[in-house]
Amino acid sequence: MAGTLLQPVALGTTFAGRVSGQRWKSHGTRRPPSMLAMSLSRPVKMAAFVGLRSVHSFSVTPVTNFRSTVASYRSRRGRRARFVTRSMFERFTEKAIKVIMLAQEEARRLGHNFVGTEQILLGLIGEGTGIAAKVLKSMGINLKDARVEVEKIIGRGNGFVAVEIPFTPRAKRVLELSLEEARQLGHNYIGSEHLLLGLLREGEGVAARVLESLGADPSNIRTQVIRMIGETTEAVGAGVGGGSSGNKMPTLEEYGTNLTKLAEEGKLDPVVGRQPQIERVVQILGRRTKNNPCLIGEPGVGKTAIAEGLAQRISTGDVPETIEGKKVITLDMGLLVAGTKYRGEFEERLKKLMEEIKQSDEIILFIDEVHTLIGAGAAEGAIDAANILKPALARGELQCIGATTLDEYRKHIEKDPALERRFQPVRVPEPTVDETIEILRGLRERYEIHHKLRYTDDALISAAKLSYQYISDRFLPDKAIDLIDEAGSRVRLRHAQVPEEARELDKELKQITKDKNEAVRSQDFEKAGELRDREMELKAQITALIDKSKEMSKAETESGETGPLVNEADIQHIVSSWTGIPVEKVSSDESDKLLKMEETLHQRVIGQDEAVKAISRSIRRARVGLKNPNRPIASFIFAGPTGVGKSELAKALAAYYFGSEEAMIRLDMSEFMERHTVSKLIGSPPGYVGYTEGGQLTEAVRRRPYTVVLFDEIEKAHPDVFNMMLQILEDGRLTDSKGRTVDFKNTLLIMTSNVGSSVIEKGGRKIGFDLDYDEKDSSYSRIKSLVVEEMKQYFRPEFLNRLDEMIVFRQLTKLEVKEIAEIMLKEVFDRLKAKDIDLQVTEKFKERIVDEGFNPSYGARPLRRAIMRLLEDSLAEKMLAGEVKEGDSAIVDVDSEGKVIVLNGQSGLPELSTPAVTV
């Protein structure tokens, strides 16, 4: 912390003693000022370091000043110099540095040209936040009293301060003792607590007299410091006296966490189930050699929980005698590697760790993400952690539990057979829904305490079931636990909000405060006084409302009554917000929307009752939860002639029920006519361009799992596409090029095809031409059977057999074409309204459009061309000529010769052939 020195610092043996006013130990007389000035002009040397450059404000002094100061002190007398390693300086913590800087400031304040033990004591008290400051404060020692005592003992200096403020020999001794104390405690840093321990251990000097004057007991202070840094007085006393810490494990304590201790303190979550896995782990740990289980499973299935469960069993004594009394220590590999700047540091740390484990014989090491051992610490010519640990793992000297995912195990550990044979794999499967419910019940109390609310049984059951059904890219119980956690957070935030009445009063308060300030600026003090009184009144009302709300919540919690409650609806809301799939119960508004779906779709799709009804039935079935959960919502193939509304129906459904036409995933299958383009659906294979981008179909469905998927012109696709779609239609799943399973269970699949168009054209001449209903219906049935036969010849039977329904669209009648014409004309009117032009057309013009646009073989597309030619082209010419401008109204009619005329409604118009109408 205090800086890194690349070379040992050579420090001289001479030392400038205390300044004028203080006796020198080698002389009985005071030193004259000339000698003092001469001695101060020379560099000051000491065994550790001499001091720091003076600063006027500690808070703005960067740490680099401390480093550069320490690094700059080198002895000019190299032969007689004593070398001190860099380890002492680089181990100072930020708080220890602050203590030294404050000690220097105290020396300047008192006018002393030295830093003694008393200044270090004042620095320890003044630092305020460290362990040393807290202990001294608890003993009743404050900075003011300590300063008074220091001045009583040594007085004030003459105010002359040298550029470099040195440490006295006794202060230097305190720093050396603090390093020893840190080592004996097993710490690789020097903090404020170690400086205080060094000060107490020195036992003499001004600081000891100050503490004695203030009534502090040094042994009591030491005991409190030891207690606060987690050690016992006896252990440290033995370490100090004997010079060896015996059974202490400083490296393991620094880089590991004792799970057994956490279990004894009740800080671990309860582990429910997993009995077979825990028993297998215990069996492997009891082996003589290669006693290292490796937990392998998908992310989130509870691998770490098994290690925690073992620690809990050990803490309660519910284990065989072979591992009774052992400690489960989880190793932080990141912390172990961090800071190893020089070659050999990482290996040294790891070897120390292994030695401590071997000597203890009661440690079970748990390494989460055990694959990080491979390559950890490896550099040019260095050995990684896995190779260092291999001998100990094989001989049984080190009991290690590893945990990793299946993918990481395959990528890293299986590639190294020597490491793989040292670990015994323990498969951790994903728990079932019922097991997950039991796990959630076991965790319920912890989450209720954290969120300060209660969970119903229905909430826990729905969390397990809904997460299993709708969240497909994660694993139980992790996703179910996350659901109840976020639902608890949502409910807690909802109940913690300010009451609505208080919010309204707060708005009024802000306005009154603004008006009051304005009145003060305009010197209308009478009005400002009235507003101030109103402001105070509102503040009191808001405070009273908030307090009342808090009291009610507290009373509800204490009485065990209603209070915040997480129910099934809250879980459903979280699932919907995660996935976009509506799983909440159907509201009354949505019920009306679903029941009137046919009517709404017919506003855009004219005719085609069979298709509209089939689509509506499937959506209603899925929304109320009656569909097969392992298949898509529905899968249709729309066959029929071109231009009758097959693609339009899919767009209308997406716009009406899913929010917008953009909510639909549309794939034009004419883009997948060649064999090599088929892979674009699921992603390019490894080694090909586009592998990292994912598939067009799979990525779109992963991002939006609840949607309409339209495969337009399906018969244009390469035959390999149909092979790929078999598992989508049957099981609602597809695996992309990266091996990820994409869920299609909440998609509505629509395929359009023109197969059978020729059959419809030949057999449909009678359809819609003044036939009675029975004749129309029988003709449609006959045509449908012919189209289905033709589709069977084109598509493979296993593909057709997986479809829910094959719907044959009818040819459009002239009456239906007229209705479509009105819809298309309305679109033109809306575009002109944006340009502030009001357009009207006559009935005669409509009939002209229908006559030209009606073609049973081509559907409604000729109608669009007729509107473009007869209406849009004529109108564009008039607008360019300036005859129709913004703000005008235009009327489109047909004259006696059949020509289209556009008349400006602002001028006098001749009598129209038929009344003008708007759509």
UniProtKB/Swiss-Prot annotation:
<feature type="transit peptide" description="Chloroplast">
    <location>
        <begin position="1"/>
        <end position="54"/>
    </location>
</feature>
<dbReference type="InterPro" id="IPR028299">
    <property type="entry name" value="ClpA/B_CS2"/>
</dbReference>
<dbReference type="InterPro" id="IPR004176">
    <property type="entry name" value="Clp_R_dom"/>
</dbReference>
<feature type="region of interest" description="Repeat 1">
    <location>
        <begin position="92"/>
        <end position="157"/>
    </location>
</feature>
<comment type="similarity">
    <text>Belongs to the ClpA/ClpB family. ClpC subfamily.</text>
</comment>
<keyword id="KW-0934">Plastid</keyword>
<feature type="domain" description="Clp R">
    <location>
        <begin position="89"/>
        <end position="231"/>
    </location>
</feature>
<protein>
    <recommendedName>
        <fullName>Chaperone protein ClpC2, chloroplastic</fullName>
    </recommendedName>
</protein>
<dbReference type="InterPro" id="IPR001270">
    <property type="entry name" value="ClpA/B"/>
</dbReference>
<dbReference type="InterPro" id="IPR036628">
    <property type="entry name" value="Clp_N_dom_sf"/>
</dbReference>
<keyword id="KW-0547">Nucleotide-binding</keyword>
<dbReference type="GO" id="GO:0009507">
    <property type="term" value="C:chloroplast"/>
</dbReference>
<dbReference type="InterPro" id="IPR041546">
    <property type="entry name" value="ClpA/ClpB_AAA_lid"/>
</dbReference>
<dbReference type="InterPro" id="IPR019489">
    <property type="entry name" value="Clp_ATPase_C"/>
</dbReference>
<feature type="region of interest" description="Repeat 2">
    <location>
        <begin position="167"/>
        <end position="231"/>
    </location>
</feature>
<keyword id="KW-0150">Chloroplast</keyword>
<dbReference type="InterPro" id="IPR027417">
    <property type="entry name" value="P-loop_NTPase"/>
</dbReference>
<dbReference type="InterPro" id="IPR003593">
    <property type="entry name" value="AAA+_ATPase"/>
</dbReference>
<feature type="binding site">
    <location>
        <begin position="640"/>
        <end position="647"/>
    </location>
    <ligand>
        <name>ATP</name>
    </ligand>
</feature>
<dbReference type="InterPro" id="IPR050130">
    <property type="entry name" value="ClpA_ClpB"/>
</dbReference>
<dbReference type="GO" id="GO:0016887">
    <property type="term" value="F:ATP hydrolysis activity"/>
</dbReference>
<keyword id="KW-0809">Transit peptide</keyword>
<keyword id="KW-0067">ATP-binding</keyword>
<dbReference type="Pfam" id="PF00004">
    <property type="entry name" value="AAA"/>
</dbReference>
<dbReference type="InterPro" id="IPR018368">
    <property type="entry name" value="ClpA/B_CS1"/>
</dbReference>
<comment type="function">
    <text>Molecular chaperone that may interact with a ClpP-like protease involved in degradation of denatured proteins in the chloroplast.</text>
</comment>
<dbReference type="Pfam" id="PF07724">
    <property type="entry name" value="AAA_2"/>
</dbReference>
<dbReference type="InterPro" id="IPR001943">
    <property type="entry name" value="UVR_dom"/>
</dbReference>
<dbReference type="InterPro" id="IPR003959">
    <property type="entry name" value="ATPase_AAA_core"/>
</dbReference>
<feature type="region of interest" description="II">
    <location>
        <begin position="566"/>
        <end position="757"/>
    </location>
</feature>
<dbReference type="Pfam" id="PF17871">
    <property type="entry name" value="AAA_lid_9"/>
</dbReference>
<feature type="region of interest" description="I">
    <location>
        <begin position="252"/>
        <end position="499"/>
    </location>
</feature>
<keyword id="KW-0143">Chaperone</keyword>
<dbReference type="GO" id="GO:0005524">
    <property type="term" value="F:ATP binding"/>
</dbReference>
<dbReference type="Pfam" id="PF02861">
    <property type="entry name" value="Clp_N"/>
</dbReference>
<dbReference type="Pfam" id="PF10431">
    <property type="entry name" value="ClpB_D2-small"/>
</dbReference>
<feature type="binding site">
    <location>
        <begin position="297"/>
        <end position="304"/>
    </location>
    <ligand>
        <name>ATP</name>
    </ligand>
</feature>
<keyword id="KW-0677">Repeat</keyword>
<feature type="domain" description="UVR">
    <location>
        <begin position="506"/>
        <end position="541"/>
    </location>
</feature>
